[in-house]
Amino acid sequence: MPEGPQALQSPPATIFLLLISAAGLGPGCQALWVEWGPPSVTVSVGEEVRLQCTHNGSNTNVTWWHVLQSNSSWPPVMYRGDVGAGGELIIKPVNKTHRGMYRCQVSDGKKIQRSCGTYLRVRDPLPRPFLDMGEGTKNNIITAEGIILLICAVVPGTLLLFRKRWQNMKFGADIQDDYEDENLYEGLNLDDCSMYEDISRGLQGTYQDVGSLHIGDAQLEKP
């Protein structure tokens, strides 16, 4: 069995290949690249916008170029704005003159890469609503209004029904007794009555049953 130090020895060819690989992957041999970025960004007048310029360079110089909106065939103009860490372009506050295409250029020594560009759209601010409330608050208000309307419609009618019932229970018996004690013939002048409506006959029947009488004994009442 070989000793320990002899077993840990590596062939020179393997060490040479590892050195070549490390040299090939060093910072100087890496290709510089820049991300495309979003195709467009929309903001309102007066807001702040931040355009990213993501790249893999270590010692780079980032510049931004602005392509005017009126004519894209014109050469881009260097935009001298506020550039943050990592080449981020900061525009605040935004106005309509900032519209157009923005491209970042990354320089690392002799290597230069550019992004595809991001178009900045600037629109007028949305009108502020009279009642700036959320949807949940609006739904709660509508529910409360419905409950209030239901109460306003049901409660008065219910109170009127109970009031009418209470009046009938309190005064119904007295009114009924008054109608029973009232003399229906009070104030009636018997002389002015028709002879067919003579109420002074007492219990005498108005008509006679001629079917139950004999013909000889029939005595019809004369009018």
From Swiss-Prot:
Complex and partners: Heterodimer of alpha and beta chains; disulfide-linked. Part of the B-cell antigen receptor complex where the alpha/beta chain heterodimer is non-covalently associated with an antigen-specific membrane-bound surface immunoglobulin of two heavy chains and two light chains. Interacts through its phosphorylated ITAM domain with the SH2 domains of SYK which stimulates SYK autophosphorylation and activation.
Ranges that cross the membrane: 141-161
Tissue-by-tissue expression: B-cells.
Entry domain remark: The transmembrane helices of CD79A and CD79B chains and two IgM heavy chains assembly in a four-helix bundle structure that appears to be conserved among different BCR isotypes.
Membrane topology summary: Single-pass type I membrane protein
Chain's role: Required in cooperation with CD79B for initiation of the signal transduction cascade activated by binding of antigen to the B-cell antigen receptor complex (BCR) which leads to internalization of the complex, trafficking to late endosomes and antigen presentation. Also required for BCR surface expression and for efficient differentiation of pro- and pre-B-cells. Stimulates SYK autophosphorylation and activation. Binds to BLNK, bringing BLNK into proximity with SYK and allowing SYK to phosphorylate BLNK. Also interacts with and increases activity of some Src-family tyrosine kinases.
Lineage per the UniProt record: Eukaryota, Metazoa, Chordata, Craniata, Vertebrata
The protein's name: B-cell antigen receptor complex-associated protein alpha chain
Gene Ontology biological process terms, A to Z: adaptive immune response; B cell activation; B cell differentiation; B cell proliferation; B cell receptor signaling pathway
Organism, scientific name: Bos taurus (Bovine)
